[in-house]
Amino acid sequence: MGKYFGTDGVRGEANVELTPELAFKLGRFGGYVLSQHETGTPRVFVARDTRISGEMLESALVAGLLSVGIEVYKLGVLATPGVSYLVRTENASAGVMISASHNPALDNGIKFFGSDGFKLADDQELEIEALLDAEEDTLPRPSAEGLGTLVDYPEGLRKYEKFLVSTGINLEGMKVALDTANGAASVSARDVFLDLQADISVIGEQPNGLNINDGIGSTHPEKLQELVKETGSAVGLAFDGDSDRLIAVDENGDIVDGDKIMFIIGKYLSEKGLLAQNTIVTTVMSNLGFHKALDQHGINKAVTAVGDRYVVEEMRQSNYNLGGEQSGHVIIMDYNTTGDGQLTAIQLTKVMKETGMSLSELAAQVTIYPQKLVNIRVDNSMKHKAMEVPAIAAIIEKMEAEMQGNGRILVRPSGTEPLLRVMAEAPTDEEVDYYVDTIADVVRTEIGIA
């Protein structure tokens, strides 16, 4: 991570940290870095979610792009993966999404996609940061015909919807409940599932700029759970603010998280011989029950650090086609280059329809182990050195020995705060409490701060 760019672009409180001035500079410098080797007029696609600050930041960002001679295609409200898809299929120079994903409405963010539809490499982000920190802006300042032009491109949404529908099958007779989080999916999910002939019910479809992710969506699926039971739906599908993740609800109102969704889709692909190298890419936070289910069905796994960008890196390097996170980011590389909630939802319902199995039956193939996570405040200089403390290393080794292979311990530093995270999984809640609390007590004694 750099000074401005985090693991998912530039984020902050809109108009306080992520200001219009910064958005203008990101448009100007980001547009230049991503298009400097173009021979013709560069084209950049820009979209946003439904936050009240979106149009303010969009205007500033677009002005920056236009100031370096870029032709800007304004997509309006669109899911993040829609930008990625359109950039790649329409041969654009780059794409920019204005969103803070699952964060509350006061936050916003700006993330770039290269011409290949993938998020930027670290060296490209550092190049943009160097321009942001330079004492003087020395980039070209074209005038007259050298300036960029602005094109409204509402047909981008239709093209993305058509693509999504093309990946699915007829869902006639299936009751589907949708929660679009008052976010980007609110402009597309209804149309997509109606085109697939599903019988739908929808909540979270009235964005007002302030209610995105507010007690709704993939991080707050409680209302969707109620809707599924009220309507007798076969499945509930909850997206986040920019629709790059999915959390599902089965016909009984129970949550089906990213681990289970990945397993269901992965097993289906594996049985058809379509799972590349018969491998699913996951992160260290995936549940032990997910790993055991993969082992039982002869499916391989590749494990990365936390963050969908690391999952994508591993997928690209090793040519895997399915990966994701417990949080609901699922990347299906045969179709798109980033997590896509609506695409994942379509593939999940396809498996249900083709197998004739209910979602609860499909999800029951993975037994999720109880999990507990405790955050312990430590000196920032010590959070990366915890395993070098003899007492901490010893207690972890002792707890792992007691588990006898039927549990898991993960101790890792926070990426942004002076915290050490202690996580354990085991067959019962009592065992999880014992393992986590025992380790946490030693960590607090050795390196904890008040």
Curated annotation (Swiss-Prot):
Pfam families: PGM_PMM_I, PGM_PMM_II, PGM_PMM_III, PGM_PMM_IV. It comes from Streptococcus uberis (strain ATCC BAA-854 / 0140J). This is Phosphoglucosamine mutase. Its EC number is 5.4.2.10. Mg(2+) binds at residues 101, 240, 242, 244. PROSITE patterns: PGM_PMM. Binds 1 Mg(2+) ion per subunit. The gene is glmM. Activated by phosphorylation. It comes from the Bacteria.
